[in-house]
């Protein structure tokens, strides 16, 4: 549960600047999803080359200062192709619990680092990166996970979900439940859906149902919920 009036207030501000400000900055996320969808082939003979193409437009979603998850998982795929292929097959297996899949991917990355890291201190395959892989594969179901932003959104909307550092399983499960609730509200906003439809181009992941807008079109194009400071309050995009 959360304060729906606070969400509506945030959306009023968001819609005022979506086309001129938000979309130009965030369009690349829709393009990253389409790039992944077009190039992903779990059975590719050269899995590392395929993965490189699939992740080629993710930009800062999978690379930032001192954080290089895309580069590292591609390196592992070059060295241990079948192990990494199996990791993604398991991660994308919707018949299994999502947290168990995320945790398994992380633990297997630890093993890869120990054996093939060549002295590297990090594998960078943590909840943020792993949920991003899930989002790229299933953009109508998953979201990008950033704990500090999730906590900010939860506080701003006065939700009854709790997020605590180190509580990995509860955080992941509460995160998806919370954002799904927000999506349910956004899908009722026709103005949001129309705004998104007016901006989608051929380079973007298509959104045939136009179910929502801000949360990555609430399960379609994916733009995920993320706080932006506007008049000292968090708005979502």
Summary of predicted features, one role per range:
Residues 1-123, 139-237:
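An N-terminal alpha-helical hairpin/helix-loop-helix interaction module that forms a charged
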């Amino acid at each position: 549960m959360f304060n729906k009036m606070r969400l509506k207030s945030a959306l009023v501000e968001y819609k005022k600047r979506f086309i001129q400000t938000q979309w130009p900055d965030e369009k690349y996320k829709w393009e990253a999803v389409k790039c992944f969808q077009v190039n992903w082939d779990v059975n590719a003979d050269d899995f590392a080359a395929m993965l490189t193409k699939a992740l080629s437009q993710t930009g800062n979603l999978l690379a930032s200062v001192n954080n290089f998850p895309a580069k590292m998982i591609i390196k592992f795929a070059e060295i241990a192709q079948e192990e990494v292929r199996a990791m993604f097959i398991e991660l994308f297996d919707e018949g299994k619990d999502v947290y168990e899949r995320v945790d398994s991917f992380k633990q297997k990355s630890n093993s890869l680092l120990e054996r093939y890291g060549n002295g590297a201190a990090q594998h960078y395959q943590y909840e943020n990166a792993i949920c991003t892989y899930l989002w790229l594969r299933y953009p109508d179901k998953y979201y990008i996970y950033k704990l500090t932003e999730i906590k900010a959104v939860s506080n701003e909307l006065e939700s009854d979900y709790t997020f605590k550092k180190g509580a990995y399983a509860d955080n992941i499960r509460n995160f998806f439940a919370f954002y799904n609730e927000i999506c349910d509200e956004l899908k009722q906003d026709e103005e949001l859906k129309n705004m998104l439809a007016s901006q989608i181009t051929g380079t973007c992941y298509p959104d045939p149902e136009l179910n929502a807008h801000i949360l990555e079109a609430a399960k379609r194009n994916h733009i995920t919920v993320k706080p932006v400071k506007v008049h000292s309050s968090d708005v979502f995009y």
